[in-house]
Amino acid sequence: ADMTLKNHFRMDGSSYHVVDYDMRTGKVRSRCTAQGYSDESAWARGQAWGIYGYTMCYRYTRQLKYLEQAEAAYEFVCTHPNLPEDLIPYWDFDAVNIPHELIPSSAAAIKAAAFYEFTIYSKKPKYKETADKVMHSLSSSDYRSKIGENHNFLLMHSVGSYPHGNEIDVPLIYADYYFLEALKRKRDCDIEAKSKSVQK
């Protein structure tokens, strides 16, 4: 976690996909974004992994540096000028044909699950508000499958690796997983908020 914190992230809070290290010295040999538009671009699912991963690092270690990195990544993603109004990101924030690029539900589901986890550790309402908006979008007919359709997956329009032509605009099991995890975390947050309001 510390090595990734040191070498994967850019000053603006975004991250590379892959960092190649010298096996003998541990020094960085190269940085790239294999599944993104370019090495210096911000691949959407990679940004979601960064937010999710460092929120979970904080959960288990309580080291503030991890939460701060998750927050920096959140700010990059949620204030990016190329983020659509429904908060479902294009497959890469720097893809050349925006707004005519694929919009993967998979990246959004990971983000939502992370944002709900973040609400446990921050009093700022923006994290839950953002997560709720993402889930509202994912639950719409634009992304949510009808029962019995889409091979019985919950979400449509995920993207695996666009540059490699793999899993393009298809359902993906991990998108459904993080969607369900986000729903569970949303439910927990809502129950806790209701309990606090009753106690008042």
What is each model feature region?
Residues 1-200:
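Glycan-recognition and catalytic cores of secretory/periplasmic carbohydrate-active enzymes
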